[in-house]
Amino acid sequence: MVYSYTEKKRIRKDFGKRPQVLDIPYLLSIQLDSFTKFIEQDPEGQYGLEAAFRSVFPIQSYNGNSKLEYVSYNLREPEFDVKECQIRGVTYSAPLRVKLRLVVYDKDAPANTVKDIKEQEVYMGEIPLMTDNGTFVINGTERVIVSQLHRSPGVFFDSDKGKTHSSGKVLYNARVIPYRGSWLDFEFDPKDNLFVRIDRRRKLPATIILRALNKTTEEILDLFFDKVVFEVKDQTLMMELLPERLRGETATFDIEANGKVYVEAGRRITARHIRQLTKDDITHIEVPVDYIVGKVASHDYVNEDTGEIIIAANQEFSLEDLANLSQAGYKKIEVLFTNDLDHGAYISDTLRADSTVDRLSALVEIYRMMRPGEPPTKEAAEALFESLFFSEERYDLSTVGRMKFNSSIGRDNDEGAGVLDETDIIEVMRKLIDIRNGIGEVDDIDHLGNRRIRSVGEMAENQFRVGLVRVERAVRERLSLGDLDAIMPQDLINAKPISAAVKEFFGSSQLSQFMDQNNPLSEVTHKRRISALGPGGLTRERAGFEVRDVHATHYGRLCPIETPEGPNIGLINSLSAFAQCNEYGFLETPYRRVVDGQVTDQVDYLSAIEEGTFVIAQANAVLTEEGTFADELIIARQKGESGLHPREHIQYMDVATNQVVSVAASLIPFLEHDDANRALMGANMQRQAVPTLKADKPLVGTGIERNVAVDSGVTAVAKRGGVVQSVDASRIVIKVNEEELVPGEAGIDIYNLTKYTRSNQNTCINQRPTVLPGEPVTRGDVLADGPSTDLGELALGQNMRIAFMPWNGYNFEDSILVSERVVQEDRFTTIHIQELSCVARDTKLGSEEITADIPNVGEAALSKLDESGIVYIGAEVKGGDILVGKVTPKGETQLTPEEKLLRAIFGEKASDVKDSSLRVPNSVSGTIIDVQVFTRDGVEKDKRALEIEQMQLKEAKKDITEEFQILEGGLLARVRTLLVAAGVSEVKLDAMDRKQWLEITLDDEAQQNQLEQLAEQYDELKAEFDKKFETKRRKITQGDDLAPGVLKIVKVYLAVKRRIQPGDKMAGRHGNKGVISKINPVEDMPYDEKGQPVDIVLNPLGVPSRMNIGQILEVHMGLAAKGVGDKINQMLKEQQELHKFRNFLQKVYDLGETRQEVDIAALSDDEVRTLIKNLRGGLPIATPIFDGAPEASIKELLKLVDLPESGQLKLFDGRTGDAFERPVTVGYMYMLKLNHLVDDKMHARSTGSYSLVTQQPLGGKAQFGGQRFGEMEVWALEAYGAAYTLQEMLTVKSDDVNGRTKMYKNIVDGDHRMEPGMPESFNVLLKEIRSLGINIELEDEE
């Protein structure tokens, strides 16, 4: 196996046995691909902005004299880059410019004579852009647009499963759902009539739709019924016989022909009878005359002499009608064929219930239902019906909808119009009637072939189209009104509605969410989340069990494990590791193709529909060397059912064992040994892990840690290979390899690192270089670690030495006992950065001012402020300290204009100001790490703002100069090579100024040309950098675009270092969570025979009932892995030769039957030394899920490092030194510190703010509220008879306003008495009763 440069530094031993057919695809592609589709120019005009423009333009004026056409669009460059946008609190977006063409026709000339054409580029608002990591920066905060799982457009056949009607009869229905437009529903009622609803309004007989499509009764009956023909011969009736139609009927008369009785009267007709009739080729039988009574005429029968209708279509026959018909000379009579089994008379019955007679009356009926109360006219009724399903402006099935529609009603082709036509509607009714007749199945709505993914691009496009449609109306009106000769396209378009629609979507849509930025995993998972909620989706309250449940088609597409606990369970899902979206938006998953029992490496992506009938083997099926199945019978899936299949029948095979689950669940080692509920908690809690001060890779991992870390974008990854030229804390410079150069560039890549910035969750984002100068790197290598990554691997927590044993009740109910050593070594110390901001506004009484001159504040309180009134960087502050001094004018009276004038002339200071400074919140203390000042354009900058500006300019200049020097050096080095090759002596060159080299003239023309090219490049480079600096300078010095009424904003960043302490929540990766109960001195912790104490003691009772055995295996494996590190340390202590290390390492990596081949001999001595150095803390191990290390391998590894195979050690009590009576399971578990810190939750109140109406204290930490003494607590005091305690609880401690002020005063005076009065809530009750019109008065006791 080939390892990249970073991977060689620390090779993870892989216990996986199945070969890796397919690497996990790029994890954020669902976001990036979708958005790229949205903004890229699409010549077909099917997707993105192009599609939106084409669907709205051209816009015709009402009078037809002019139209506005769309030509093309382009997105300009964004003004600020992502980092600048985050600092300034603005949206990262690009201006959209659209080229429009206004065509004016000559109204006096014949039709369509063009009078004038004007083209112009028009600004159409800003389009937020996606960053490289799949997020959007909206108003300075990073947000993610979550993809939505919604019902695919198309037609769905469903039933109510017998729940609607009391009889329990199953009623079937069909629903045509367009991508946009009105829904069309067909449904049966309990009497088997077919009804139609439009947009879920009141129902009408379904035949009204057919009548509105201009069908007569005869045509309607023709469409849905077969006919039976009777011939009238000399007083007898002969019936045309199709034997198949008789099955299941009971003969009411003898069925005979040619003198032979086939079925006696009263007998049921069976398949045997039908076979005999078919065999004897019987085509007609005689039937009694009354057999036709009750049958239904298929068309009108007219007496040709008189012109009167004897019997109308859809009327039932009587004997009288029969007589009239034979009198009128009819020899053949056609009736509808119906029976109770599989040819119901539904449409015929519905026609009888339908009161309409022709097209107009049907249209009027539909109009009345859609627009009740409006008087219908013929034109209005026609226009309404036309616009409902047949107009492209109002109705669109979309490509997906048409594809699903056609496949649902059994057509072969995928294409078709976006609107419906009459055949579509008739086919839907036909299929619904077939289903009612028992032919065909209803659809499964939860099948992933019926639900599709709507991603960012598509949702943004829809919003954009909404904005365009709003603009369209305005444009139409302006075109009809204005003087068209003077008007330009720019005057017609108002960009506001468009940008408003887009802004609203990105800023406040339910699916635009504040990014979860706790750690790299939570970022990745958030971007891969699939929600069924949101606009056009489900609501929590309405969603039943079926929608939330795991469906067979989720296999390899949506994760069955990772979903929130609580009301959203099952509605919010996560994409499986290998899942992708196809062009229609359906989820696909990869499978290896199996050809004639041979498993190939060809991978096909199948959607849930395509997967339908295939037989698919699991990834852990045993294969032979040749790639065929080893066993005769193989566990495989077909149509969602698992079973045993012969190996010849297998058509596909899973690509990987973690194909079923999401990324977060694939990070849990030994997942296969955990109960699903606990695995769910484990997957969810990894997302809440806070990045620790020193990241520590998991000793026991699953091998995909590197994928997550690199794809999340928190690490710096080499874009091209090369050699590291220089490294410091904030930048890495790489000289690119010759073969990867683009001709004519300097060949230097510069990576600027992010230092100590704040994440959305207030954790700290910081990148640290992992490479040294002179090291070779290849493309894709990790150059710098981000938060929670260690040498390019995800590292969410710390490897802790744990023991499973009770310890004095300190681990009762999942509590955790932690050693003091963990605190001393800062293992779980985390840095949290808070942003506090102070805004100076313009008020009615004058403007607020940021200043150090604050009334009634002592010197001590101002000690940390500079002369501008802003805190120094590096100051240590605690609760209540002033960070930014600010005063607000408080005016008793509004100034008269005269006074204002005098003030303006003599510059008198505002009469009266009050202190409104920004202070540190009560429970917070920390260090100031950064201050930023934003000043409105036109307001003079204060001293501090100018200092910050100078500093930023200096930094920018330094950065740009250094970058220029590096690139210049690269270019001049190439010049030197060229000159030396041309024969210029090196001594001379070194004596000259380097820039003069470019002025040398060479004899060889080709070389001279090359030199001139390089000189040209040098000039270009210089010009580019000057321009770059100028742009940067402009950005830094220009005023900021602040909200209206805001003069200045000061943002202060405060870093808090939080050590672990009792009350913090910790967890393992298997759903084993708990709260720290005590930090124990090291000397009291249990220790082993070598004297090594454990770090954490966990309760063994937390394992059996929760069935997460994975944690036990992880602990044993961790012990073995750490054992390898200890062994290496011992060998280093003994100063053994390098070849012994090589042998030991080879032995370790060869252990077990694994797919991994590590050849230690192929590594250079330096590489082996680096590897040894990185393995001293333990050997990192990968046990992929469902393909992990077996028990035997764990025992083998334990044996190799001289540890007991049981994984249990003899422990001694740290307090007494006595041995515990049984060996204890000790090992290493990867523990996480979750973002539920006791510091954020602890809260106490003495006095504080009160609610306005009830006058009771507020609740919650944010409001500095009190503890609620609720109903049940009152009952408890009542039960104890504690009357006085109860009285003070209900009065002075709560809402007796006078009582509590008096009591406060008494306490100050040292007099501890209370006088309870009337609680305010009682007054509220009185007022409420009075508001009902009942007067209630309190009488004083005389």
UniProtKB/Swiss-Prot annotation:
Reaction(s) catalysed (UniProt annotation): RNA(n) + a ribonucleoside 5'-triphosphate = RNA(n+1) + diphosphate
Q: What class of enzyme is it?
A: transferase
List GO molecular-function terms, semicolon-separated.
DNA binding; DNA-directed RNA polymerase activity; ribonucleoside binding
Name the InterPro entries on file.
DNA-dir_RNA_pol_bsu_ext_1_sf (IPR042107), DNA-dir_RNA_pol_bsu_external_1 (IPR019462), DNA-dir_RNA_pol_su2 (IPR015712), DNA-dir_RNAP_su2_dom (IPR007120), DNA-dir_RNAP_su2_hyb_sf (IPR037033), RNA_pol_bsu_bac (IPR010243), RNA_pol_bsu_CS (IPR007121), RNA_pol_bsu_protrusion (IPR007644)
One Pfam match? RNA_pol_Rpb2_45
The entry sums up its family as follows:
Belongs to the RNA polymerase beta chain family.
Task: Quote the protein name from its UniProt record.
Answer: DNA-directed RNA polymerase subunit beta
Gene expressing this chain? rpoB
